[in-house]
Amino acid sequence: MPSIRVALFADFHFSTPSDLEVLSTLKRQMIAENPDLVLFAGDYIGSHDLYDDVSRETVVKSLEALAFPKPAFAVLGNHDNWDSNEAWSDAFEGSSITLIENQVERISLNGQAICIRGLGDIYSGYWKGLEIPAKCEQRAITLTHDPAGLLTPNATVETLSFAGHTHCGQVAFPLIGAPIVPTRAPRDMHCGQFDREGKGVVSGGLGSSIIPLRFGPLTAPGWELIDINSVN
């Protein structure tokens, strides 16, 4: 079965036009890596106070250019929801990026039929329980913002899953790690790969929140490239 290459981006936290300049570098990296699928895990703005110099529409168009011509799916993060869930949903509507909030889309990639389940952000109160439809034949991946939204009542994960939100702590110190990570997800789901019956990846993301600083060996900004050999 052919593999699927997934690009995962999270937590851009755009606040000014200059913040968008990073996208030209990311685009060059994307062209070089040639993913089959692009996932955006939310938090596109820097704060929930509406800013005038970078509109939602500008952000969405910039993300479209980054993903083009690959199929792309997105969920909203807590900062986007605190700004306006409705306005961000409107900004994505009609774009080439499918906003997949609490719904499932079935697509074909490399000859495989795969379901993508998008879950609303649990941290800001937009999460809804959503079962994987039978039509997905156990071939599904899940995308959400806060990794806490991936957990079942038994603290397991149902599908191959992707999230962001944590910034891998953003500020982390030797020995003690990050003093604050704003999620109810367990520590093994704060950063990078995890395995809770279902496997997944939590991206540390690209931007910063509250303070313009990242500190610590695992907190450097970045995006994830994941090669999936099978989806089951």
Features from the language model and the residues they span:
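Short active-site segment of divalent metal-dependent hydrolases/proteases
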Residues: F14, I45-G46, A148, C168
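N-terminal signal-anchor transmembrane helix
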Residues: M1-D36
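Active-site neighborhood of phospho(di)ester-bond hydrolases with catalytic His/Asp-centered motifs
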Residues: F9-A10, L37-D43, P71-N78, I100-Q103, ...
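Binuclear metal-dependent hydrolase catalytic cores centered on His/Asp/Glu-rich metal-binding motifs
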Residues: D90, G94-I97, E101-Q103, L109-T152, ...
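Active-site-proximal beta-strand elements of phosphoester/diester hydrolases
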Residues: S3-H13, A113-I122, I141-H145, G198-G205
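Core catalytic region of metal-dependent phosphoesterases/phosphodiesterases
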Residues: V22-S108
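Conserved beta-sheet core of the metallophosphoesterase superfamily
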Residues: P147-I228
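Short acidic-hydrophobic surface loop/beta-edge motif
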Residues: M1, Q103-N110, H190-R196
